[in-house]
């Protein structure tokens, strides 16, 4: 996947998460993910992250402002995301992750990850922050 700073460097433009909204060949090839991806259609920048053993993201905040135009949902799509294989920390608290689980990520809070095993894969979706999508998120989490 292409980081936002790298995309901005390559294009010479100030891009937003919503500028990445065209389905790619990977989307077409991964038909098993269509029910989840299409639930939020249209999406902003969306990527699959495959963390190898030792892979990590340092503590950071992606967007500290309440006025951001997207929110983030992450789906853990491999088996190597259990507590002994993968660490997800948010605001100083380690969260237990379930394979197949889908989680809202509050990117205003400090978060970090660390993978202890190969093939810790997750789907990161930046979803337009519309009233309809916020209601979808709340409705989905009521059944959690």
Regions found by a protein language model. Give the residues of each.
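Active-site or metal-binding loop neighborhoods of secreted/extracellular toxin and effector enzymes
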Residues: 135-144
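Asparagine-centered strand-capping/turn motif at beta-strand->loop junctions
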Residues: 111-116
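A short hydrophobic beta-strand segment most commonly corresponding to one strand
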Residues: 71-77, 102-104, 117-135
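Conserved short histidine dyad/triad with adjacent acidic residue
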Residues: 47-67
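Non-heme Fe(II)/2-oxoglutarate
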Residues: 1-39
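A short catalytic or substrate-binding loop motif that flags glycine-/basic-rich loops and adjacent residues
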Residues: 39-41, 65-69
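Conserved metal-binding segment of the jelly-roll/cupin
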Residues: 95-110
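A short beta-strand-loop-beta hairpin characteristic of the jelly-roll/cupin
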Residues: 76-98
């Amino acid at each position: 996947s292409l980081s936002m700073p790298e995309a901005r460097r390559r294009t010479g433009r100030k891009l937003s998460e919503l500028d990445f909204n065209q389905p790619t060949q990977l989307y077409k090839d991964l038909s098993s993910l269509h029910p989840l991806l299409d639930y939020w259609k249209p999406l902003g920048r969306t990527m699959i992250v495959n963390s190898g053993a030792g892979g990590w993201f340092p503590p950071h905040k992606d967007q500290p402002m309440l006025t951001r135009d997207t929110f983030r949902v992450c789906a853990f799509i491999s088996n190597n995301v259990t507590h002994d294989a993968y660490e997800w920390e948010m605001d100083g608290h380690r969260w237990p992750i379930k394979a197949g689980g889908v989680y809202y990520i509050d990117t205003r809070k400090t978060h970090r990850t660390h993978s202890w095993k190969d093939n810790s894969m997750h789907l990161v979706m930046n979803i337009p922050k519309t009233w309809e999508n916020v209601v979808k998120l709340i409705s989905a989490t009521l059944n959690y």
